[in-house]
Amino acid sequence: MEPAIKYRLIKKEKHTGARLGEIVTPHGTFKTPMFMPVGTQASVKTMAPEDLKEMGAGIILSNTYHLWLRPGEDIVEKAGGLHKFMNWDRGVLTDSGGFQVFSLAKLRDISEEGVAFKSHLNGEKLFLSPEKAIHVENALGADIMMSFDECPPFFESYDYVKKSVERTSRWAERGLIAHQNPATQGLFGIVQGAGFEDLRRQSARDLVGMDFPGYSIGGLSVGESKGEMNRVLDFTTPMLPEDKPRYLMGVGSPDALIDGVIRGVDMFDCVLPTRIARNGTTMTSQGRLVVKNAKYSEDFRPLDPKCDCYVCKNYTRAYIRHLIKADETFGIHLTSYHNLYFLINLMHQVQDAIEQDNLLEFREAFFEEYGYNENNGRNF
């Protein structure tokens, strides 16, 4: 049986671990490395599907936990799956719900069977197991699905993380058995292990032995420093097969994207660009710009003079500041669109740099202009 997800390696960058590739899904092909906008509840906040296509998004992420609780996977399935439900004909990836259960849910109780917890919406008692998570993801119909895993805190004890990794491997195997649609939905395994190299190796070895069509790196961007994250990536990505995609979960700051690519990561997602946009904060080639600040009230330049998105072509900082201060939703739409475009376009620039074997030079120039080399509060 042909796998639902195929990865083709196009080129390796000469001086780093970066890879140029493409991923084929049942709903189209996209080039990697790439950034995925997050549509938590089957919608990227304030964005129409047409906006996402216009900015070049090839795949978006939705959250299994939220859609399971509301509207329910049965309703999405009756609609014909997420693609039809939200009128999106490109790729969709769903997480397993595990991260939300471990971070949002109250009074969770972890056992070998799964996790008992209370809904963050109404306090209802619920239970999520590897089989249930896969059942929900099968019903949602995403092109790429995630295994149900435990995401332990980064600074948890070695003994706890070891037990957690072993349980995550057992859960991954149970999820594979429960998976009903391997020909149309690709299920990824998630490598855990916090900051411990031997536990990351154990996790990777277990999962690679199960022959998933792709692998996620979980348990990062959860409070550790960027240096710690890069240290873990340095030893984790080489443990993963070269002929499968590698996905770093929950990472979306420009520096972390570039540094992740340098270490061999192909896919990223994060709520960061839309979350900060709702607070009037934007990413520009010159670093962070908080457009809601008073100093922009008479600034009639675009958010980023170097950006060619439709927001920067048509609207000024002063106008966008006015909208944000007046609580107009259109202002949040404009900042969200720009931030998503900025990251998707950044990944296109990174792809070009890999093609030209000058990714390290690109990183140096980008970091200098963005302000990452100074402690000036402009960066993320």
Curated annotation (Swiss-Prot):
- What SUPFAM superfamilies does the record point to? tRNA-guanine transglycosylase
Listed GO biological process terms: queuosine biosynthetic process; tRNA wobble guanine modification; tRNA-guanine transglycosylation
- GO function terms (MF aspect): metal ion binding; tRNA-guanosine(34) queuine transglycosylase activity
Active site per UniProt: D95, D269
Q: Mind naming one GO cellular-component term on file for this protein? A: cytosol
What cofactor does this one take? Zn(2+)
Cite the residue spans of the region called RNA binding: 250-256, 274-278
Annotated binding of Zn(2+), by residue: C307, C309, C312, H338
Top EC class for this record? transferase
Question: Sorted alphabetically, which InterPro entries does this protein's record hold?
Answer: ArchSynthase1/Queuine_TRR, TGT, TGT-like_sf, tRNA_ribo_trans-like
The organism's place on the tree of life at top rank: Bacteria
This protein's UniProt keywords: Glycosyltransferase, Metal-binding, Queuosine biosynthesis, Transferase, tRNA processing, Zinc
Q: How does it assemble?
A: Homodimer. Within each dimer, one monomer is responsible for RNA recognition and catalysis, while the other monomer binds to the replacement base PreQ1.
What is the stated purpose of this protein? Catalyzes the base-exchange of a guanine (G) residue with the queuine precursor 7-aminomethyl-7-deazaguanine (PreQ1) at position 34 (anticodon wobble position) in tRNAs with GU(N) anticodons (tRNA-Asp, -Asn, -His and -Tyr). Catalysis occurs through a double-displacement mechanism. The nucleophile active site attacks the C1' of nucleotide 34 to detach the guanine base from the RNA, forming a covalent enzyme-RNA intermediate. The proton acceptor active site deprotonates the incoming PreQ1, allowing a nucleophilic attack on the C1' of the ribose to form the product.
Family, per entry: Belongs to the queuine tRNA-ribosyltransferase family.
Name the chain's protein: Queuine tRNA-ribosyltransferase
Q: Which organism is it from?
A: Latilactobacillus sakei subsp. sakei (strain 23K) (Lactobacillus sakei subsp. sakei)
Per the UniProt record, the lineage of the source organism begins with:
Bacteria, Bacillati, Bacillota, Bacilli, Lactobacillales
| Gene for this chain | tgt
